[in-house]
């Protein structure tokens, strides 16, 4: 889940 957060870039 946290790793998907970086995709918010």
From Swiss-Prot:
It is found in: Secreted. Detected in the thoracic perisympathetic organs in larvae, and the dorsal ganglionic sheath in adults (at protein level). Disulfide bonds: none annotated. One of its GO terms (biological process) is neuropeptide signaling pathway. The keyword Metal-binding does not apply. It comes from the Eukaryota. Keywords: Amidation, Neuropeptide, Secreted. Its main location: secreted. The modification Phenylalanine amide is found at residue 9. The keyword Secreted applies. GO terms for cellular component: extracellular region. Belongs to the FARP (FMRFamide related peptide) family. This is FMRFamide-14.
